[in-house]
Amino acid sequence: DIVMTQSPTFLAVTASKKVTISCTASESLYSSKHKVHYLAWYQKKPEQSPKLLIYGASNRYIGVPDRFTGSGSGTDFTLTISSVQVEDLTHYYCAQFYSYPLTFGAGTKLELKR
């Protein structure tokens, strides 16, 4: 199974500041056949289904604000929130869909810095 290592686990942030979340896969997620990285980022709020933010490592899903950006290649990927809003303070997960079983990072929780 592909292991997804996500960091940090917890992040205290200030509103309007830039945030970066990292994810490392235990093997490359790049398909030379399809020329795509099989890496996605999800946002998960309490009592709600996970929301797809980024697919193919860098493609923003329909309706996702442009403050969310995905980047990276091979095994190393990043989710950047350029200016964190209060509604962004929740859990984020990376996931690989290169091979079965599909596997997820352990998650990153964003909270407001006090």
UniProtKB/Swiss-Prot annotation:
Residues 104-113 are annotated as: Framework-4. Residues 95-103 are annotated as: Complementarity-determining-3. The keyword Transferase does not apply. The keyword Disulfide bond applies. Residues 1-23 are annotated as: Framework-1. Disulfide bonds join 23-94. One of its GO terms (biological process) is adaptive immune response. Keywords: Adaptive immunity, Disulfide bond, Immunity, Immunoglobulin. Residues 56-62 are annotated as: Complementarity-determining-2. Residues 24-40 are annotated as: Complementarity-determining-1. Pfam families: V-set. GO terms for cellular component: immunoglobulin complex. Residues 41-55 are annotated as: Framework-2. SMART domains: IG, IGv. PANTHER family: IMMUNOGLOBULIN LIGHT CHAIN (PTHR23267). Anti-phosphocholine antibody. This is Ig kappa chain V-I region S107A. It comes from Mus musculus. The lineage of its organism: Eukaryota, Metazoa, Chordata, Craniata, Vertebrata.
